[in-house]
Amino acid sequence: MSDQATRPARTPANRRKAAVDDSEALGIRERNLRLILKAASQEFAAKGFQAARTEDIAARVGLPKANVYYYFQNKRNLYARVLETLVEPLLQAAALLRAELPPEQALPAYIQARMRVAREHPHTYKAVLGEMLLGARQLPAPCGERLRQAAQDNLACLRSWMERGLIATADPQHLLLFLWSATQAHTHFGWQASLITGKTRPAEADYRAVAESVSRLVLGALAVDGARGRLRPFPL
């Protein structure tokens, strides 16, 4: 009897069952990847790359350590993936600083987007900040290049506004660094912030309040003569 004769017929019902099985397998894989990355971001944020252990990451998820290696091969690959997950949100925020937009619209939108990244990805954000303090040596090169180009685009936007008299003249590099530091302070300096706020973890309303305060301070400081009446408060 031929092999073809012994195989089950490829009926529509069989094909539907195979498609369901494939979909379920893909769903399990995506779920495991998401859970492992979340657990890894928590471990790396708390302990850094060197001290974080793969078995502790697996324990957070409730999976065998072998499963972590199955999906990511080694801890270094997993760390790189954690860092990569924050790149796209940061780039989306950076894209909001556009020279064709008025600064009173673009700057608050950029500040709010940066604060949203910190709020929605607190552990990953902290892990990335820790890596940057070490020189971003383990950040994948393509990610670093995209972030570098986005920063250059943001500087060009700030220069354009200054040259057209839309905002007061200042060193655009210093201004961009200030925007970065102001929007990541709650994540980077959590303990220091708690001394002022009395909260161990900021709530969503706290992030919104910080975004509004920073926006008003920045717009007020950058207002040029005759422009203060034109700059309107940013509604959050």
List the model feature ranges, each with a label.
Residues M1-V20, R116, E120, R148, ...:
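C-terminal peripheral helix-coil segments that are non-catalytic and often amphipathic
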Residues S23, V82-A109, A151-S160:
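Amphipathic alpha-helical linker/stalk segments
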Residues N32, I36-F44, R114, V218:
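Short hydrophobic clusters on alpha-helical segments that form packing/core surfaces
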Residues N32, K75, V82, L86, ...:
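Hydrophobic/aromatic residues within well-ordered alpha-helical segments
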Residues L35, E43-N77, R81:
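Helix-turn-helix
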Residues A46-Q50, E100, H121, R164:
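Short coil/turn segments at alpha/beta junctions that flank glycine-rich nucleotide-binding fingerprints
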Residues A95-T124, P172-L179, R208-A211, A227-R228, ...:
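Hydrophobic alpha-helical connector segments
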Residues A106, R119-A141, F189-T197:
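Amphipathic alpha-helical segments used for helix-helix packing
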